[in-house]
Amino acid sequence: MEIKKINDQKVQYFFEVSSKELETQLASAYEKIKPKVEIKGFRKGHVPRKIFENRFGKDNLYSDALENIVQTKYQEVLQKKDFESMGMPQVIDLDEKKLKDNQNFTFGLEFIVKPKVTLKKYLGLEITKDDLEVTDYEVEEKINSLLEKQTTLESKTQNDFLELTDIAIFDFEGFVDDKPFEGGTAKDFSLEIGSGQFVPGFEDQMLGMKQGQTKDINITFPSDYHQKSLANQKAVFKVTLHQIKTKKIPQLTDNLVKSLKLVNASTVEELKNNTKQTLLAQKKHKEKENVEKQVIEQLVKNSELEIPQEIVSQEQIRLQKEFEAQLKQQNLTLEQYKQYLGIDDEKMEKEFSQQAQKNIEYQLIMEQVAAQEKLTISQEKIEQKYQNLSNHYKVPVNQIKQNLPEKNLKHSLLMGEALELVINKAVVAK
């Protein structure tokens, strides 16, 4: 093993791998896939490796073997504890020809050295807090929102006018320069007047219309309109109003509350009390997030650290993959998401990069706080957290442990305790 220090941020380790070690890993790689291999003339799982290689080639086996070798050498370096690394090392100077010729070959691993963090002030930080008070007005607004969900619609008469909050059922066709445009036509469209769902000015001009009436509505698309070709364009919409419906909000009574079958609330008084407690809990949660943000911003400002771009890039890739997985669960792609929000690749990449930078800063600073304060996480706390997660997600503890390695959970708990310590030592400004 040869070691080369490039600078304070990078260290390279070089290894020589014998053909014997390579062959051992190739055999191991094939044994892993052998049970699934099917070739005519052989029983499934009993295909000789030579036959497999002649039919499908060796690339996959070499790739798997190299991955195992890299992991082995990586662990060897970590066990030496010569330095603290961040992220995954990069494979460098791989002699691929000798590798695929089953000869002794060499390769290197380039590690990013964990940056040094100099903490200045981290205890006694000054923070601000809001008064945690829930007003009767806030409770009333929340309950009104609940009542609106129980709203029924009643049709207005032929002579009634269209008013604010009414639901209009209408056809429309839009024209720019006397020509219809894509997306500018709809039949039996339903719109709550005053909701602001349409282009500014559209809903205002519909006020006062009667059922059966046709009217031209003139608007100008805003400069930031999502359909770029229509931005700043003047348009005329021919609107035919078919039906007007008005919302009927039920009266708040004990009987209504009972009919809603809410948890811990069967009377108006209980509903008000529960609503107040819910709003208070939300405010406490929001305040907690606000305090954490204040503390982290001050810690970053009060710290000296230089983060290698490679680490930020690795975290950026991780964040993007994680986000794409979340979108996939909602049957969305990243491209669809960007199109929906009207953002381009550059803006999306910038957002991921900024978040990655913040994540790494937070991790390094909290690790330094934990080290300076000699914080530790007991096995009891780890097991308790596993149990809490099991109860929350209603899955067995063993399944939680499979998805969340103890090392990762321990690190997360340590970061949380470090942050909690700094917050508890903070001073609230008066």
From Swiss-Prot:
Domain of life of the native organism: Bacteria
Segments forming domain PPIase FKBP-type: 165-250
Top class in the EC scheme: isomerase
GO-annotated biological processes: 'de novo' cotranslational protein folding; cell division; chaperone-mediated protein folding; protein transport; protein unfolding
Gene Ontology MF annotations: peptidyl-prolyl cis-trans isomerase activity; protein folding chaperone; ribosome binding
EC number of the protein: 5.2.1.8
Keywords: Cell cycle, Cell division, Chaperone, Cytoplasm, Isomerase, Rotamase
InterPro entries reported for this sequence: PPIase_dom_sf, PPIase_FKBP_dom, Trig_fac, Trigger_fac_C, Trigger_fac_C_sf, Trigger_fac_ribosome-bd_bac, Trigger_fac_ribosome-bd_sf, Trigger_fact/SurA_dom_sf
PROSITE patterns xref list: FKBP_PPIASE (PS50059)
Cysteine disulfide links: none
Subcellular location: Cytoplasm
Known catalytic reactions: [protein]-peptidylproline (omega=180) = [protein]-peptidylproline (omega=0)
Gene3D superfamilies: 3.10.50.40, Trigger factor ribosome-binding domain (3.30.70.1050), Trigger factor, C-terminal domain (1.10.3120.10)
One CC-aspect GO term: cytoplasm
Function: Involved in protein export. Acts as a chaperone by maintaining the newly synthesized protein in an open conformation. Functions as a peptidyl-prolyl cis-trans isomerase.
Family that this chain belongs to: Belongs to the FKBP-type PPIase family. Tig subfamily.
Domain notes: Consists of 3 domains; the N-terminus binds the ribosome, the middle domain has PPIase activity, while the C-terminus has intrinsic chaperone activity on its own.
Protein name: Trigger factor
Species name: Onion yellows phytoplasma (strain OY-M)
Encoding gene per record: tig
